[in-house]
Every structure is written in structure tokens, then in C-alpha cells.
Amino acid sequence: MALIEDALYKRIKNRVGRAIAEYGLIEDGDRIAVGVSGGKDSYTLLHMLDTLRRRAPVRYEVVAINIDSGYPGFRADIIEEHLHENGFTVHMEKTDHYGIIKEKRRLDSSYCSICARLKRGALYALAQQHNCNKLALGHHMDDFIETLLLNQFFVGALKAMAPGMLADNGLTTVIRPLVYVSEEDIIQFSRNNRFPVVCCCCPVCGSADQQRRRMKELLKELEKENPYIKKSLLRALANVQPRHLLDKRLKS
């Protein structure tokens, strides 16, 4: 399919390109696994990386990978069909994460956190299996900001996400090229291009992450007073002033 090359397309492409350049996310010879969940974010990321690849000053490969967590009703076939139709190299993996979560999860533990850890490990393994040195994930600007607030409000830590970092396995570099792209733009871009969005079919999807939903609501309220609040919060992540913080480890 040919993407609709309107002003929105150009804005997203420019912001992805800016993130890649500023943080050195892609280098010559990279083989990048893109985690494609079937959601709007990962489709946008995949198509943008492929678009930029065609005119990039460096040569890199893009490989689409998907982890089926085993939730009943998940339509992996729809994702696979879209990827093949658009000429992507595709690797799909079926797991029984759903069964593992049902068996191992404690009543007081988060369903989402266990699922995320299992899926992350599977993505790392699949990327390594197919000789990919980098794993691209579809976290966008709103995810960075919401994570910053969640960690401050509920964890007591001043942290969010990194646009690029070495994974815990010490082998795979995780990159997040959508750091400058808003969720609002991604929603519209996905609609414009009619991406076949697939629900993960998790039994608690849409109800479990109440804290993140509250952060979205809070930001929406604050935007009424300050339309630039998201840009300001994102800018704060790149403007850390250690002398004005309390962490003794930062003192020279």
C-alpha cells in the first residue's frame, strides 16, 4: 500500500528522522527488528522506518516481528497478511504467555506487568534469533510523558524512557524513534491509511492500567491551561539540572 503523503505524513516522517539523527538511533549496517503488535503505534513506526530507509544516508534493514501471547481471539493472521502485502520480512511467534500468566500470577500482582515482561523477553529472543542488533518499539511522545509522571507520582523516581538504550540482555539495543510524535498524530495517521488495527484480546485490556489513564486525563486538563505542556514536559527530560536535585549520587 502507498501511504497518504499529506502534511501529517511529512510531520511524522520529519519528527522520526529528527529523533534518529539527534540520538544516533540507526547506524550503517543495522538490522532492525520492529515489534509489530497490530496496534496503531507499531504500524506507524514500521512504515515510517521503511519509508526513511529508502532515502537514508546509511544502509539498514527492517524486519517485522510479532509475538502472539496466546490470548483467545487474537487475529495474528490479519497482521501477517498486512505485513506480507506490504513486502516486509516477517517473523511471527506463537507463545502461551496467557497460560503462564494465569498459572503464575499472584492475586496482588499486576496482570499487565507480567505480560509486558514476558513479551519483552520474547521480543529480545526473536530479534536475536533473526540476527537483528536493534529492536524498535512504538512508544510515542505521550508514553514518555505519562511514564515520567507515573514514576514521580507512584514510584518516587525521576525517570521515564530512553530513546535508545542497551537492553538487559546486553545484546540488543532498544530504540524508540517515535519519541517526538504525539499519540494524536498517530491515531489520525492510522485512520488515514486504514491500518488493520488488531486488539490484543487481553482479558483485562482497557481496564487494568487505571493509573496511566489518570495521567492521560490529568494532561488533558492541564492542556486547557497550557497547550504546550506536553512539549514542556518532554523538553524537561532533555534538560536535567543535577545541582538542583536531591540524589546524593549526583553530587561531585
From Swiss-Prot:
<dbReference type="GO" id="GO:0051539">
    <property type="term" value="F:4 iron, 4 sulfur cluster binding"/>
</dbReference>
<feature type="short sequence motif" description="PP-loop motif">
    <location>
        <begin position="37"/>
        <end position="42"/>
    </location>
</feature>
<keyword id="KW-0963">Cytoplasm</keyword>
<dbReference type="InterPro" id="IPR035107">
    <property type="entry name" value="tRNA_thiolation_TtcA_Ctu1"/>
</dbReference>
<keyword id="KW-0479">Metal-binding</keyword>
<feature type="binding site">
    <location>
        <position position="115"/>
    </location>
    <ligand>
        <name>[4Fe-4S] cluster</name>
    </ligand>
</feature>
<dbReference type="GO" id="GO:0006400">
    <property type="term" value="P:tRNA modification"/>
</dbReference>
<dbReference type="GO" id="GO:0016740">
    <property type="term" value="F:transferase activity"/>
</dbReference>
<comment type="subunit">
    <text>Homodimer.</text>
</comment>
<dbReference type="GO" id="GO:0000049">
    <property type="term" value="F:tRNA binding"/>
</dbReference>
<dbReference type="InterPro" id="IPR011063">
    <property type="entry name" value="TilS/TtcA_N"/>
</dbReference>
<comment type="similarity">
    <text>Belongs to the TtcA family.</text>
</comment>
<dbReference type="Pfam" id="PF01171">
    <property type="entry name" value="ATP_bind_3"/>
</dbReference>
<dbReference type="InterPro" id="IPR012089">
    <property type="entry name" value="tRNA_Cyd_32_2_STrfase"/>
</dbReference>
<feature type="binding site">
    <location>
        <position position="112"/>
    </location>
    <ligand>
        <name>[4Fe-4S] cluster</name>
    </ligand>
</feature>
<dbReference type="GO" id="GO:0005737">
    <property type="term" value="C:cytoplasm"/>
</dbReference>
<comment type="function">
    <text>Catalyzes the ATP-dependent 2-thiolation of cytidine in position 32 of tRNA, to form 2-thiocytidine (s(2)C32). The sulfur atoms are provided by the cysteine/cysteine desulfurase (IscS) system.</text>
</comment>
<keyword id="KW-0808">Transferase</keyword>
<keyword id="KW-0408">Iron</keyword>
<comment type="pathway">
    <text>tRNA modification.</text>
</comment>
<keyword id="KW-0820">tRNA-binding</keyword>
<protein>
    <recommendedName>
        <fullName>tRNA-cytidine(32) 2-sulfurtransferase</fullName>
        <ecNumber>2.8.1.-</ecNumber>
    </recommendedName>
</protein>
<dbReference type="InterPro" id="IPR014729">
    <property type="entry name" value="Rossmann-like_a/b/a_fold"/>
</dbReference>
<keyword id="KW-0067">ATP-binding</keyword>
<keyword id="KW-0460">Magnesium</keyword>
<dbReference type="GO" id="GO:0046872">
    <property type="term" value="F:metal ion binding"/>
</dbReference>
<dbReference type="GO" id="GO:0005524">
    <property type="term" value="F:ATP binding"/>
</dbReference>
<keyword id="KW-0004">4Fe-4S</keyword>
<keyword id="KW-0819">tRNA processing</keyword>
<keyword id="KW-0411">Iron-sulfur</keyword>
<feature type="binding site">
    <location>
        <position position="202"/>
    </location>
    <ligand>
        <name>[4Fe-4S] cluster</name>
    </ligand>
</feature>
<keyword id="KW-0547">Nucleotide-binding</keyword>
<keyword id="KW-0694">RNA-binding</keyword>
